[in-house]
């Protein structure tokens, strides 16, 4: 049986935040894939072109594979020394072959395009969340063990919830505050995103939306996980991918996908190539970049740029972008994400009937990525968002580790005694992304119409240009879309 057809368990508690914007909304919000299915046998191009692709992340690799398959000459320029971009699995400095995700961690069961690539490259998947074991809930200094799939007993916690919130519990807050929005989403036509009917929400952030309905500070903190300032439209849009019965991860590490995609393109990728200038001429495009300390220039008929706009805005271009494109390049926001990974001598929490995952009263998630990896040692890791992620990113690695170990000791007493080592990662501090994933803020949704439009011979791909920002699916979809544009260009 295909691993994608295994039983679909109930939503993990972390997903309840947006579970009410479910399958009906997903059908409305997700546009169709391009007709060129990955691995399909498209008709070879009658007029092959040379195409430079900036970035060997998932979007760039998807575009390159498709164009190469139909006869175009492709060259990828990648600043890093590895493929994958923000799909990045950390294996060092961990022992015994352990690994954890610094980048994209979850693959929704509804993301058929991503799963088709996983099947194409014969990779296996495992459930992202453990399917057994209790979880820890740490709120206002009170630690509580919650049975798998259950909700915390509010009588044992110090909370500042309203009477009606206490009545439904933490597990009912999403339903309490999203029922009306769910009905509105279901009623919308399939006419593209963002919908005109949603214009009344264009100046509303997520936290404000909750507070307008009487949500308490604790309810807002629990539901938003640090995304209070996120546009309500952005939150609703992203909710579709979360509100699924199952999330997967790739066995062996999510970076196995971009590594597999890069293998047939190995001689067409130039690593360590930092782009300095993009120039369009009447005849084509010129890209100036540095590699090995030397200035290099490449020319081509067309160019696909997958560089995040947070980085692209510092690259010289000639001629300048159109006004709409320049504005979105200048203003687009990539949310900060910081992660701390702690290796322990044993997975002692499992002997206590726990699976290692936890919910805390801070804008972060706590994961146990090694729950299904072989060996005795384990990793506990944090996934920190927004304000707190920015705060962590400004600390030294040792300060981040000390702070996280102190928190983990509250969640899983005994971490200090079992501690063997740790490492950190900040996408805000990573020079080739300067952020983790696109977050659309209040007032910015109307600018999105410019994010994916070509500029002359330059085409754009990447999660930020897709209907699924922040997801592998978005990167793949955008790469195929850009490849289609190039192939169909006159």
Report each predicted region and the residues it spans:
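N-terminal export leaders
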Residues: 12-29
């Amino acid at each position: 049986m295909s691993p994608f057809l295994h039983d679909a368990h109930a939503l993990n508690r972390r997903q309840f935040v947006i579970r009410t914007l479910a399958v009906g909304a997903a059908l409305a919000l997700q546009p169709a894939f391009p007709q060129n299915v990955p691995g399909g046998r498209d008709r070879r191009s009658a007029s092959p072109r040379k195409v430079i692709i900036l970035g060997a992340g998932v979007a760039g690799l998807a575009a390159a594979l498709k164009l190469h398959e139909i006869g175009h000459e492709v060259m990828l320029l990648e600043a890093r020394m590895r493929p994958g971009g923000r799909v990045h699995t950390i294996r060092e400095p961990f022992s015994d072959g352990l690994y954890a995700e610094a980048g994209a961690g979850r693959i929704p069961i509804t993301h058929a395009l991503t799963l088709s690539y996983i099947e194409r490259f014969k990779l296996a998947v495992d459930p992202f969340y453990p399917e057994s074991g209790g979880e820890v809930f740490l709120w206002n200094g009170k630690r509580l063990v919650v049975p798998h799939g259950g909700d915390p007993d509010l009588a044992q916690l110090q909370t500042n919830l309203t009477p009606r919130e206490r009545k439904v519990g933490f597990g009912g807050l999403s339903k309490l505050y999203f029922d009306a929005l769910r009905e509105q989403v279901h009623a919308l036509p399939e006419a593209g995103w963002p919908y005109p009917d949603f214009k009344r929400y264009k100046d509303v952030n997520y936290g404000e939306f909750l507070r307008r309905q009487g949500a308490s500070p604790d309810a807002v903190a629990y539901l938003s996980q640090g995304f209070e300032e996120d546009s309500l439209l952005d939150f609703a849009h992203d909710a579709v991918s979360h509100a699924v019965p199952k999330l997967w991860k790739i066995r062996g590490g999510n970076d196995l996908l971009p590594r597999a995609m890069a293998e047939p393109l190995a001689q067409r990728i130039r690593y360590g190539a930092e782009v300095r200038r993009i120039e369009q001429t009447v005849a084509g495009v010129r890209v100036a970049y540095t590699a090995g300390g030397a200035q290099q220039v490449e020319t081509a008929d067309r160019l696909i740029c997958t560089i995040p706009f947070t980085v692209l805005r510092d690259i010289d271009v000639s001629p300048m972008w159109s006004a709409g494109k320049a504005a979105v390049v200048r203003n687009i926001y990539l949310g900060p994400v910081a992660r701390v990974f702690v290796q322990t001598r044993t997975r002692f929490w499992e002997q206590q009937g726990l699976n290692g995952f936890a919910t805390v009263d801070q804008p972060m998630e706590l994961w146990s990525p090694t729950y299904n990896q072989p060996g005795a040692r384990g990793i506990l890791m944090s996934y920190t968002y927004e304000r707190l992620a920015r705060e962590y990113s400004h600390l030294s690695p040792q300060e981040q580790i000390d702070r996280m170990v102190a928190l983990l000791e509250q969640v899983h007493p005994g971490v200090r005694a079992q501690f063997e080592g740790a490492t950190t990662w900040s996408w805000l501090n990573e020079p080739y992304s300067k952020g983790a994933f696109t977050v659309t803020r209040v007032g910015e949704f109307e600018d999105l119409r410019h994010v994916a439009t070509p500029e002359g011979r330059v085409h754009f791909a990447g999660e930020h240009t897709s209907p699924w920002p922040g997801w592998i699916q978005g990167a793949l979809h955008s790469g195929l879309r850009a490849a289609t544009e190039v192939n169909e260009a006159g």
